[in-house]
């Protein structure tokens, strides 16, 4: 184990601690499992800190390091504050990459995955994250997916899991179904890059639409979520309130009436066209009703163009890609008694609403574009304020050209215009009358679709269904779970492997005993990750999915850390499963995550050859200083060593393809894990992108080194040492502690200032971690360490200085745990025996709360320092004095003085500043150490 952590040790540079002690401390740091056995004491505060578990790709990247550093920092603080903390780690282990790797490396997906898990576990331990390793789980282990299958059966029994034939996205290369979100904007597969095809297949779904309202409404009960993420969820669910309006077919041959969903029923008189999707269910009937073969050929050509656009642009909607087709057919509208032309438009989606819309170009941007392309008339039907109407008329007169703005809504009067017999009626009255006459019907519509969970892949959770010709789809009995994946297989990657394994697929029907077959689809990996946070709380339970008692005590998760890329689907699916399990009375909570912390990307310079535009590895980049022949000035150029071409530099997300990734192990080998984690937390707020900067990590290393020097210098000053600057054999007398009874006035003030800053820092660091502004907490620690470093030699002999060093060391623990552990032990154990009674014994309860327990040299057992109220009371404050914004002095004044203006104006040092001048304004502000006052003067 020592070899695994050697890199962390050698970068600490601690001269007074031998390697054996250092090794023991670090191993203690890695293997401590504070919460191996959960206490069942309900009076004990709980805290569940969770980072999104990784896919075991084999190598950690800096994005991983950042997310786990954040959750680890929070968990360490909460443990020190006395919370019963859950901070687990596991593996989201199913999925396509394992199958692809199995093909490339000629190993089974299981073997490849388990090797990667072992490797990444070691990497995480090298980073010294304090995870509860006893809770470790992997979604590809049968002990886990047995319960994923149990959830499926419960959903099936509740009518929330079902199978139906559906048009799916088919990847012709990977031979699998893709969810919509796995198809990029160009209509290509997210992994194979193949052009995705449409295919009809029977698929399994979870009925997430049944909870669309709860999933929307309950977002308002989550103050710990950002508005950005909540809005993303709401937009994905897409709830809207409106009405259904029917348009009657006037076709000669069979053609159904078309019903539209609209949120603006009051605009019915402004309808210029009826538009449907080119993929509408009635498209064949429409084709049959076209006037002649020439028109049908035009339709076929149009549909071909639409498919080409879809393959190229996917779901992107751009005016340039708008394609419409006038069928020449009309539909009758009973409300307006008008005949409306039927248009095909690729801006209408077949799977949203009814797949048809009524076009009101006077009051809708997209409708306006269709009308413009088809040369249809605009008819405004919503009244606008008179003043705005006049402005609009003036604008039209001035420009004398068509303006697109004419189709948009203005401030409405609430009354209809140009609406026949209904002109002048208020909107609400008009809609109510249509509802009463049953001409329109209220409808709530959702953009979200049911969750397609079927995947035609081998490496996933088997769906526990047996297909029988007599009995249909039969659920596997719970006592026969798990339905295990066959592990000893030869994987080729062609088609669905499970469908080819007759010995696994062919079984007896549990109901009738007839020959039957297993369902060969496996589950979407999002199913596995939709409930893993619950299993962490009882990961070894072989009798039930989890203990409801434990889950009810520790859920919901207090802080969930992960990337913004999972802000929609993973969170939505987890919320759905949580609500279902509550309905099943397995848990008490309906929302899984109290606080979401979505961290930003980790970025670094990307170098590209200016000619080929190909990424270049940093080792092949050279920085040259070149003098210009004309000006003689020096210019720095970035050159590709391999080609001699100039290099462009951009700051982008770290990735293998861009050759701009930073290997965490290399950084740990050079700087140590503590320095890396401190840098990550200090460099940028967690929600912002972190731009990698070598100078920044060097700065963090130097800061920790300075703290080490301060602590070692304090301890060394009590030793008898050989005088280095005196005669060779002359000895310098060791120092003695300085008690408060011997302080002079200046020393008394300096000690009070140190204690004030120390206790103020306790508040600042606590607040910074609780508010996830870790950089401000580290900045406060830097200020405190600088203050201690600059203290006068005599002050460094005081008990108060020693106590401040202890507090500083304790507060470093969430950020730099190994560093904190070693220095805490040193501050407790390495004091000379003659000094221990003065510095570290007989602490009051208040002192122990602030500076730790002197009888325990293990920082893991220490409590988080709490400020003492009396230490935050100051006799003097500093007053920064400015004139016209320029600082001219800093005065130390008694806290009893509150009239700063009078104090300055009566001070002889500043009288000349006011001579022959008239004060214009006086500004009072606050500073870190007191207040500021700024006098501005009137200009003559």
Swiss-Prot record:
Keywords: Aminoacyl-tRNA synthetase, ATP-binding, Ligase, Mitochondrion, Nucleotide-binding, Protein biosynthesis, Transit peptide. Pfam families: Anticodon_1, tRNA-synt_1, tRNA-synt_1_2, tRNA-synt_1g. The keyword Transport does not apply. It is found in: Mitochondrion. A motif ('HIGH' region) lies at residues 54-64. InterPro entries: aa-tRNA-synth_I_CS, aa-tRNA-synth_Ia, Leu-tRNA-ligase, Leu_tRNA-synth_edit, M/V/L/I-tRNA-synth_anticd-bd, Methionyl/Leucyl_tRNA_Synth, Rossmann-like_a/b/a_fold, tRNAsynth_Ia_anticodon-bd. Its main location: mitochondrion. It catalyses: tRNA(Leu) + L-leucine + ATP = L-leucyl-tRNA(Leu) + AMP + diphosphate. Its EC number is 6.1.1.4. GO terms for biological process: Group I intron splicing; leucyl-tRNA aminoacylation; mitochondrial translation. ATP binds at residue 641. CDD domains: LeuRS_core. SUPFAM superfamilies: Anticodon-binding domain of a subclass of class I aminoacyl-tRNA synthetases, Nucleotidylyl transferase, ValRS/IleRS/LeuRS editing domain. A motif ('KMSKS' region) lies at residues 638-642. HAMAP family: Leu_tRNA_synth_B (MF_00049_B). Belongs to the class-I aminoacyl-tRNA synthetase family. This is Leucine--tRNA ligase, mitochondrial. It comes from Dictyostelium discoideum (Social amoeba). The lineage of its organism: Eukaryota, Amoebozoa, Evosea, Eumycetozoa, Dictyostelia. The gene is mleuS.
């Amino acid at each position: 184990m020592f070899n695994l952590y050697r890199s962390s040790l050698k970068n600490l540079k601690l001269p007074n601690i031998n390697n054996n002690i250092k090794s023991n401390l670090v191993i203690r740091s890695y293997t401590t499992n504070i919460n191996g056995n959960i206490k069942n004491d309900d009076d004990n505060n709980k805290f569940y800190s969770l980072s999104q578990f990784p896919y075991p790709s084999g190598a950690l990247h800096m994005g991983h390091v950042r997310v786990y550093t954040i959750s680890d920092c929070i968990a360490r603080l909460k443990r020190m504050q006395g919370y019963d903390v859950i901070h687990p780690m596991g593996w989201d282990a199913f999925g396509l990459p394992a199958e692809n790797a199995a093909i490339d490396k000629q190993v089974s997906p299981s073997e490849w995955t388990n090797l990667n898990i072992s490797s990444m576990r070691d990497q995480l331990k090298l980073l010294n994250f304090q995870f509860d390793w006893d809770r470790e789980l992997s979604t590809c282990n049968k002990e886990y997916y047995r319960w994923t299958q149990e959830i499926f059966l419960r959903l099936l029994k509740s009518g929330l899991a079902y199978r139906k034939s559906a048009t799916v996205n088919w990847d012709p290369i990977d031979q699998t179904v893709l969810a919509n979100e796995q198809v990029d904007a160009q209509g290509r597969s997210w992994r194979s890059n193949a052009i995705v095809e449409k295919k009809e297949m029977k698929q399994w779904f979870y009925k997430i639409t049944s909870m669309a309202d709860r999933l929307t409404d309950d977002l308002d009960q989550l103050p710990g979520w950002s508005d950005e993420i909540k809005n993303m969820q709401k937009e994905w669910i897409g709830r809207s309130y409106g009405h259904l309006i029917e348009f009657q077919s006037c076709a000669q041959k069979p053609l159904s009436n078309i019903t539209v969903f609209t949120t603006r029923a009051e605009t019915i008189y402004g309808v210029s066209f009826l538009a449907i999707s080119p993929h509408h269910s009635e498209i064949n009937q429409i084709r049959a009703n076209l006037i002649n073969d020439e028109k049908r050929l035009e339709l076929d050509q149009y549909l071909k163009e639409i498919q080409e656009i879809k393959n190229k642009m996917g779901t992107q909607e751009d005016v340039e890609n708008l394609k419409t087709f006038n069928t020449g057919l009309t539909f009758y509208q009973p409300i307006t008694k008008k005949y409306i032309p039927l248009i095909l438009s690729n801006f209408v989606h077949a799977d949203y609403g009814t797949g048809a819309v009524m076009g009101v170009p006077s009051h809708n941007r997209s409708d306006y574009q269709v009308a413009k392309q088809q040369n249809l008339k605009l008819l405004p039907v919503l009244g606008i304020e008179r003043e705005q109407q006049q402005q609009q008329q003036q604008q039209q007169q001035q420009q004398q050209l068509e303006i697109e703005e004419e189709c948009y809504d203005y401030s409405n009067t609430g009354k209809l215009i140009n609406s026949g017999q209904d002109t002048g009626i208020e909107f609400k009255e008009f809609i109510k009358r249509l509802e009463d006459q049953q001409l329109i019907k209220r409808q709530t519509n959702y953009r979200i679709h049911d969750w397609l969970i079927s995947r035609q892949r081998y490496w996933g959770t088997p769906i526990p269904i047996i297909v029988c010709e007599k009995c249909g789809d039969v659920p596997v009995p719970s006592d026969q779970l798990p339905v295990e994946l066959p592990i000893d297989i030869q994987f080729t990657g062609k088609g669905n492997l499970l469908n080819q394994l007759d010995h696994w697929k062919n079984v007896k029907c549990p109901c009738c005993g007839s020959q039957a077959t297993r369902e060969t689809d496996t589950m979407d990996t999002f199913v596995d990750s939709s409930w893993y946070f619950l299993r962490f709380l009882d990961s070894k339970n072989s009798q039930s999915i989890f203990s409801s008692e434990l889950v009810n005590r520790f859920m919901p998760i207090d802080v969930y850390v992960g990337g913004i890329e999972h802000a929609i689907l993973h969170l939505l699916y987890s919320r759905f499963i949580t609500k279902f399990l509550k309905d099943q009375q397995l848990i008490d909570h309906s929302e899984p995550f109290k606080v979401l912390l979505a961290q930003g990307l980790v970025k670094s310079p990307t170098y590209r050859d200016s000619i080929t535009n190909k990424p270049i590895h940093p080792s092949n980049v050279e920085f040259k200083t070149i003098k210009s022949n004309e000006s003689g000035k020096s210019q720095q150029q970035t050159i590709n060593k391999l080609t001699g071409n100039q290099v462009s530099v951009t700051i982008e997300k770290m990735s293998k393809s861009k050759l701009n990734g930073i290997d965490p192990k290399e950084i740990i080998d050079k700087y140590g894990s503590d320095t890396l984690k401190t840098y990550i937390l200090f460099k940028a707020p967690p929600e912002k992108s972190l731009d990698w900067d070598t100078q920044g990590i060097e700065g963090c290393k130097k800061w920790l080194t300075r703290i080490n020097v301060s602590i070692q210098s304090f301890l060394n000053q009590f030793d008898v040492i050989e005088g280095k600057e005196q005669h060779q054999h002359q000895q310098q007398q060791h120092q003695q502690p300085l008690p408060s009874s011997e302080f002079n006035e200046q020393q008394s003030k300096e000690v009070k200032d140190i204690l004030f800053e120390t206790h103020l820092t306790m508040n600042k660091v606590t607040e910074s971690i609780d508010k996830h502004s870790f950089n401000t907490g580290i900045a406060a620690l830097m200020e405190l360490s600088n203050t201690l470093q600059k203290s006068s030699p005599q002050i460094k002999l005081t008990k108060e200085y020693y106590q401040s060093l202890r507090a500083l060391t304790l507060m470093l623990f969430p950020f730099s745990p190994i560093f904190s552990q070693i220095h805490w032990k040193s501050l407790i154990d390495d004091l000379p025996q003659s000094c221990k009674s003065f510095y570290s014994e007989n602490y009051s309860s208040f002192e122990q709360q602030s500076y730790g327990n002197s009888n325990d040299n293990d920082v893991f057992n220490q409590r988080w320092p709490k400020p003492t109220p009396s230490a935050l009371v100051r006799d003097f404050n500093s007053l920064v004095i400015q004139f016209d914004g320029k600082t001219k002095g800093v005065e130390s004044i008694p806290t009893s003085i509150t009239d700063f203006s009078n104090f300055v104006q009566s001070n002889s040092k500043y009288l000349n500043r006011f001579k022959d001048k008239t004060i214009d304004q006086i500004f009072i502000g606050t500073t870190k150490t007191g207040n500021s006052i700024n006098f501005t003067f009137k200009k003559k």
